[in-house]
Amino acid sequence: MKKKIAILASGSGTNAEKIMSYFENHEIGEVALVLSNKPDAFVLERAGKYNVPTHVFNRERFYNSKEVLDLMIDTGVSLVVLAGFLWLVPTDFIRAFPERMINIHPALLPDYGGKGMYGKYVHEAVIRNQEKESGISIHYVNEVYDDGKIIHQEKCEVKPDDTPESLAQRIHQLEHKFYPLVIEELLQGLD
């Protein structure tokens, strides 16, 4: 039986789409649910392209009710994947999916992580600090932003003439290539 993946996303969903595409006809896993805190997030449209059920929630329903957590449990989700999801995940979610909830971050953690460090803010800080390399970190989710145990990292050079946008392009390429592969590896290790 295929293992089910739930994706939590807040934005356009390019990583989510790469994951949905990768697992569309996969023997090990499938994306069973895409959840978003934004009703106008483009990730919801991308999910429709793959016939993946979606669910939208607000802050109240995410933090003060069991609705979202119960939906994931009732769907039989094995792995929860954060892909551009910008809210801190409640402790009861983390307890329900111990070492089965992961996130991707556009920097080499522990550097450039934490609250407010996402997207262009990360790349601006990396360039401002004249770093020689950046990359991606895939990590387990815990109660602190970008603090969970690192599962996988990939590096890329920060070029002297890089802008936040040019660096972001190379980071996105790493994300799109490696996130589905790491998810596949984790699914293979789950009972």
How should each PLM-predicted stretch be described?
Residues 1-191:
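One-carbon transfer enzymes
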